[in-house]
Amino acid sequence: MNFLKTKTYENLKKAFVSECSARTRYEFVEYGQRMQGLEGLATITDKIAYQEFNHARMLYTMLCQKVKDNPMNNVDICFDIPFRQRWDILDNLQFTAKDEEEEAKFYQNASKVALEEGFKDVSELFENIRQVEIKHKKIFEFLYNGYKNGTLYKSDTKKSYVCPSCGYEMVGTEPEKVCPLCQAKMETFTVLLPKNLAF
C-alpha cells in the first residue's frame, strides 16, 4: 500500500498542523493571562502549550518515518482550524476546553482509520495523544469553573501555598490575597490541580 494515498497519511498531516496551531493559540492565551497578572493560570497554559509542541514533534517524526522512501519537499494540507480565542480570560478557558474536546474526537476517528489501514503504530500514537487531549480538556474545564466561581485558589483541605516570587509559604484552605512577605498577588500563586489532573 502506498502510504501517501492513505487516509492515515492525510490524518497525520492534519494532526501535525493542528497541534502546531494549538500550541500557538495556547501561547496567545497564556500571554493574555500573564498580561492580566494571572501567573498561576499562565503557568498551566504554558505547560499544555509545550505538550502540544511535543505532540506536533511526535507526529512530525512519525510522518517522516512513514514517508522516508518518498521524500517530501512540501505537504499540501487543507482543513479547518479553530479560530475562537480572544483576549477574554473566561472565554479563552472555555474555548480551549472545546478545542481539546474536538481534538480528542478527531484522534479517536484517526486511530480507528489507521488501524483499519494496517498502521498499528500510528493508531497507537493517535490514541495516546487522544488520552492527553481528554486530560487537557478536563484541566481547562477545571480552570474555567474555578476562575468563574472564584474557587481556583480554594481547597476543602489545608494545603501548602508557596509564593513563586519570594518563596514565602502559607498553609491553609487558600492563600492570602497578597503575600505577607513580598506583596505578590494571590493570582501569581501556582494553581493546585486535583490529583487526577496534575502534571
Predicted features and spans:
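Non-heme di-metal
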Residues: M1-F199
